[in-house]
C-alpha cells in the first residue's frame, strides 16, 4: 500500500485521462477482506491493494478465484547510510542493521546478497534468516532490530536496511539517499509487487487489459516516479528493468497512452475498481 490515501485515488486523474473511452470508478475500503469479496462476487471488476502472497493466501483460505491481471508497482527495500555513506567503504567487522521480522529480514538479507556483502544458502529465498548466511567475507555483524527501530541506529551501525515506509519516516529518499535498492528483477520485487486482481476468467477482458495497459503506461510511470521519488517504483516485467533516475523523473513530460486507447472498448463502459486504503 502506497500511503494512507488510496492508490487509485491518486492515480485516478491521469488514469482516467488515458482511458478516454471508458470511465473509472474508484471505491475505497478500509479493510483487506472486502475488496476481494466484491471482486469475487462480480460487484466490482478489479482491485488494487495487494501483493501476490496475500492474494494466494486469500484464495486458499476463502475459496475465491482471484488472479493477478498485472503487476503495477513495488515499494523497495534500500540500504541507507549509517556511519558510512558509501558501500565502497565497507570494512571487515562493520555492522548492518536489519528488521527482525521474517519477511522483512529475508528481503534485507537478499538485498545484501545482491550487493555482494553476504551469500545465502541455496534456496533460502524469502524465508532467509541470519542462520542462512553461507558466506560473510567481510565478517559483517548483522544487527537484528524491530523494524521501527532500525532507522534509529544510523549513528551506531555502518548501514541500515529499511523498507519504504520507515525510510520515508526517517527522512530518507530512496532515489537520493539509498546506496542500493531492490530492482524489478529481484526475487522480492517479483513476489511483493502490488497487482491488479480480478476474478479468474476476466483477466483477458478488453476493459481489464485497457486498465492494466494504462497503469503500466509511460504516463503513469512518470507520475509515480515524480510523486514518490523512489519510495514507490513502477514494476517492469522484463528482467533488464532500468534503474530509477529521479532527475529524469523530475524532468519527465506527460506522455499520451495511445496504446491503451486502442484496447479500450468502443462504448463508454465502466470499470469499477475496489481498493483498500490503509
Residue ranges, per PLM feature:
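Short, polar/charged alpha-helical segment
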Residues: 1-25, 34, 38
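Ligand-binding "clamshell"
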Residues: 57-69, 84, 156, 161, ...
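Short helix-initiation/N-cap motifs at beta->coil->alpha
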Residues: 26-37, 125-152
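A conserved helix-loop-strand patch within extracytoplasmic ligand-binding domains
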Residues: 69-118, 221
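Alpha-to-beta junction loops
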Residues: 40-50, 94, 117, 138-141, ...
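Periplasmic-binding protein-like
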Residues: 106-113, 215-235
Amino acid at each position: 500500500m502506497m500511503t494512507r490515501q488510496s492508490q487509485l485515488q491518486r492515480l485516478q486523474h491521469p488514469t482516467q485521462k488515458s482511458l478516454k473511452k471508458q470511465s473509472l470508478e474508484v471505491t475505497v475500503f478500509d479493510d483487506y477482506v472486502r475488496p476481494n469479496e466484491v471482486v469475487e462476487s462480480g460487484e466490482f471488476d478489479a482491485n488494487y491493494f495487494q501483493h501476490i502472497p496475500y492474494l494466494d493466501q486469500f484464495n486458499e483460505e476463502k475459496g475465491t478465484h482471484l488472479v493477478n491481471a498485472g503487476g503495477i508497482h513495488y515499494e523497495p527495500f534500500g540500504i541507507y547510510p549509517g556511519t558510512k555513506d558509501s558501500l565502497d567503504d565497507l570494512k571487515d567487522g562493520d555492522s548492518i542493521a536489519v528488521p527482525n521480522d521474517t519477511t522483512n529480514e529475508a528481503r534485507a538479507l537478499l538485498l545484501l546478497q545482491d550487493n555482494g556483502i553476504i551469500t545465502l544458502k541455496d534456496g533460502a529465498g524469502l524465508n532467509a534468516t541470519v542462520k542462512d548466511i553461507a558466506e560473510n567475507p567481510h565478517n559483517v555483524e548483522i544487527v537484528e532490530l524491530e523494524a521501527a527501530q532500525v532507522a534509529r541506529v544510523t549513528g551506531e551501525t555502518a548501514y541500515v536496511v529499511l523498507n519504504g515506509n520507515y525510510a520515508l519516516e526517517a527522512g530518507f529518499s530512496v532515489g537520493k539517499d539509498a546506496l542500493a535498492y531492490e530492482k524489478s528483477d529481484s526475487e522480492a520485487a517479483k513476489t511483493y509487487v502490488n497487482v491488479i486482481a480480478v476474478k479468474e476468467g476476466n483477466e483477458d477482458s478488453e476493459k481489464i487489459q485497457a486498465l492494466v495497459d494504462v497503469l503500466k503506461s509511460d504516463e503513469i510511470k512518470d507520475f509515480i516516479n515524480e510523486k514518490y521519488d523512489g519510495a514507490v517504483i513502477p514494476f517492469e516485467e522484463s528482467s533488464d528493468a532500468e534503474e530509477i533516475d529521479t532527475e529524469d523523473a523530475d524532468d519527465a513530460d506527460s506522455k499520451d497512452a495511445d496504446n491503451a486507447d486502442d484496447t479500450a472498448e468502443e462504448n463508454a463502459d465502466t470499470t469499477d475498481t475496489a481498493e483498500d486504503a490503509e
